């Protein structure tokens, strides 16, 4: 009888642990709500302070390591967007200065490695990077010393009624080391 109670207690404790583990998930960013401005927002969103933006972003270069399309219902496609469309065209890199971003991108159609500089501003009220013509922006989701997660405007597509709608991606960026950045600059200067 004691053995049966012991097994029952073990079973109850295991079920409780599994229940708590499934409730405490880091997947809060795996589902977005579409805001009135049409931009997806994560369910749990905390703005990134100006101090953290300066400390973690400015002066560093970041490489796209994951890109996932955000669907109209706010869910994220599991398949990597880069592989899905292009067989992975090569990651983009973003080097942030105080007021400019140098964007390094591989153009597989030519093929060529190109880079260009864009001006940006950081809107601290809603964490959007905007270049001069409001065409390209990120919305920061989370920032650490090594990883940045953003919502990225990718393009405009047509909807079923023939109108235009924005296409957004959930993107994970990793910070480059000084050596990696030097290698990127050398590769893209040729």
Q: What are the residue ranges of the model-derived segments?
A:
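Sec-dependent bacterial lipoprotein signal peptides
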Residues: 1-21
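Bacterial Sec-dependent N-terminal signal peptides
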Residues: 17-55, 177-190
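Contiguous, well-ordered beta-strand patches that form the walls/edges
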Residues: 68-73, 84-156
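Tryptophan-anchored aromatic micro-motifs
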Residues: 35-85, 118-120
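Beta-sheet ligand-binding and adhesion/scaffold domains
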Residues: 131-190
């Amino acid at each position: 009888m004691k053995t049966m109670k012991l097994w029952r207690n073990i079973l109850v404790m295991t079920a409780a642990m599994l229940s708590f583990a499934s409730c405490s998930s880091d997947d809060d960013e795996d589902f977005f709500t579409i805001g009135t401005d049409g931009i997806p927002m994560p369910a749990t969103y905390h703005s990134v302070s100006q101090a953290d933006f300066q400390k973690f972003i400015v002066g560093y270069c970041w490489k796209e390591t994951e890109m996932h399309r955000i669907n109209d219902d706010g869910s994220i496609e599991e398949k990597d967007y880069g592989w899905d469309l292009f067989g992975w065209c090569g990651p983009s890199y973003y080097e942030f200065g105080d007021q400019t971003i140098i964007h390094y991108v591989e153009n597989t159609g030519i093929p060529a490695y190109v880079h260009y500089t864009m001006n940006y501003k950081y809107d601290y009220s809603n964490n959007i990077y905007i270049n001069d013509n409001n065409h390209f922006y990120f919305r920061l989701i989370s920032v650490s010393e090594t990883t940045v997660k953003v919502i990225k405007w990718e393009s405009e597509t047509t909807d079923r009624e023939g109108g235009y709608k924005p296409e957004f991606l959930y993107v994970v960026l990793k910070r480059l080391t000084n050596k990696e950045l030097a290698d990127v600059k050398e590769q893209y200067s040729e």
